[in-house]
C-alpha cells in the first residue's frame, strides 16, 4: 500500500508540473467543413509562423470537424489544413475569433465521370489505430461483427472478440458502452464510419478494461421515420434464424428509436475427455459426450434523445431481454480404469432447462459543454433473474445407478454512475471524474439427493473509483498521462492505484506510440461461487470463493506506415487466474474442475498487418505470435510452458461490377501453450461472402459460407500438479447463411449514453 501511495503521489506531482506550464499560451480553435458545410474529421491541422512559415504545432480535427491547437504566445499565425480528397488550404488566424475553414474537393473529370481521391483506410490518432469503414469495401461486409473481423489486431471466435495480446475489449458505439454483443450483429456495416482500437486504455476507463474498441457511425441528417428490416437464415446440421426490426423517428431536436430482435439457435457438439489422476491409485477416465442445445432469445429496446441546445443533450434507453426456455441435452459414455485395470463403465444422460426471466436495463445520460468545460454523466440500473433445473440419470455397470437433480436460482441487481469533466489547461486537456457501482448477487444451489452440498451465496460488492488524466502535444509528440484509484468493498476489500502513460509521434508517414499501463482482471461471479456441478460420479465442477484479482503490467509499442500496421507488447501477470483440475478432498478419485491463482506468467505478443490495394482487389495479411513463460508442477516434474502460438489471417476483398462484392477469409492458428494448457490442434478455417445491393443501396443480399473447411476444432491438454486432462471438441460450425436487408430513410440514433458499468455487468 505504501508503494502504491508513493507511486500515486509521484504521478500527481508530475501532472501538476505539466499543467502548470505555459499558462500564457493562445488557444486557437475552430471547425473544418466541406463546401456543403459537412464536417471533415481527421484533417491534418498545422500551425505555421506568419513571419517565416516555420512549423510550430500540429493537431488533427475531431470527427465533428472541430479542432483546437495551442500557440506558444498570443500572435498572428497561419493555419495549414489538409486532408486526402481535398485541396490544401492556408488561412491566417483571426485573433480570438473561432476559425471556420472550408476545404474544396480534390477531384478531376475523366470522360464525364468524376473521380475523387480516396482517403486512407488506416491512421494513428492519439496513439490509437483508426480504420475508416465508410465508402470502403468493408462497408459492404454485412454487420458490425463482419467489420470487426477484418480490423488489424482483432480476433474473433464463436462470436466473441479479443484484441491481440490484450484480451476481451470494452466496445463502444457512438460513445455508448454495449453490454450485449448482439448489438454488433444488429448494426449494419454501411452505418459504420470508423473503428478505433485502443490497446492501452487510460485512467478514465476501469482498471479491468484491457482494451477498448470505439465504433462511430455515419452522420445522418433529415427528419422523419426510418426503417431497417433484416432476416437471416442459417443452415448447418440445424437451422438458425435471426429476425430484426429497427425503427427511428427524428424531428428537430427529438430522436426516438426502437429495436426488436428474435434469435433461434440450435447447436451440436461432440466432446472427448480423457483424465489421468496421479495419486495412490492411477485413475483414468475416458469420456465421449454428445451435446445438443436450443435457444430462443427475444430482445427489445426503446429510447429517446433530446438535444436541448447546441451544447446540451439528454437521453434514456430501456432494454429488455428474455429467453423463456433454453435447453441443453447431452449423453455421455465413460470408462473408468484403476492402475490400468477395468473399474467401471458409466452411461449418463442429462436434461438442463434454463429460464431467463425478462432482464431489464436502463441507461440515462446527460452531456453538456459550458464554455471550454465538458461534462458527461451516465447512470445504469440492471435487474435479472435466472432459474436452472438439471436432471442427470446415471447408470453404472458395477455400482448403484443414480438420479441427480439440482436447482439453481440467481438474482442480480446493479446500480452504477459515472461523471467525467474535461477542461483545456496549459496547451492540453485535463480530464477527471469518479465512478460508482453497487452489485448485489443472490445465488442458491440445491441438490435434493445431497450428493452435492447445498450452497447459499450472497455477494454484495461496492466499487468506487476516482481518476485523472492529462494529454497534450509536446513539439512533435502527443503525451497522455493518467492515474486511477479504485476501492472494492465486499468480503475482501482491495485498494489500488493504476498509472498509465503513453507517447505518440509522427515522422513523415510513420506513426508510432509507446505506452505503459497497469490493469486488473477480477474473477467472474460464477468463478467465485461455491456451487458444485455434477458431471458424473468421478467429476465435479466448482467455483472458488478465495480467488484474488489478477494484476497486469503492460508495455506496448504500436505503429503504422502507409498500409502497414504493427504492435509489440509485453505483459506480466501476477496472481493469474488459471482453469485447473484437482482432487476432491473427500475422495481423491473424484476430479474437481475449478480455478486457482498462479504466481506469475510473462507474455510476449506481436503482429504485423499489410493492407495494400491492388486495383479492385483489397487483400489484408496479418501474421502474429504469442509466447508465454510459465512453469507448472506436474506429477513430480516442472513443465516449461513456453511453446509459442502463431497466427495468420488472409482476408481478400474484390469489388465486382454491377454492385457485387466477393470476400474470402482464411485463418490459421498453430499449436502452442496458453497458461497451463497445451493447445495440440492446429486450426484452419475459411469463410466466403458474396454481396449484392439493389435500389440505390436500400436493398442488399448476403450469401455466406462459414467454416467451409470445417476446421474449427480444438484440442486442449490441461496440466496440474497431480492430474492432466485432454479435451477435444468438434462442433457444427460449418454453416451456409443467407441474409436479406432493407433500409428506408434510416438514421442512426444520436444517443450519447456511454454506460457506467459494462465490465461489472459482464462479471454478472
For the regions a protein language model found, what residue spans apply to each?
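Short, acidic, small-residue-rich periplasmic hinge/interaction motif at the N-terminus
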Residues: 46-48, 82-86, 98-137, 157-158, ...
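A short, solvent-exposed loop/turn motif at the edges and junctions
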Residues: 48-54, 76-91
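Short, acidic Ser/Thr/Gly-rich low-complexity loop/linker segments typical of extracellular
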Residues: 51-66
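N-terminal periplasmic accessory domains that precede
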Residues: 96-102, 112, 144-147, 181-182, ...
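Short acidic/polar hinge/loop motifs at secondary-structure boundaries
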Residues: 150, 176-202
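Surface-exposed extracellular loop regions of Gram-negative outer-membrane beta-barrel proteins
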Residues: 216-231, 270, 274, 286, ...
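Face-selective signature of the C-terminal outer-membrane beta-barrel domain
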Residues: 297-324, 349-494, 499, 506, ...
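Outer-membrane beta-barrel signature, preferentially recognizing the C-terminal barrel domain
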Residues: 459-461, 520-574, 592-604, 731-734
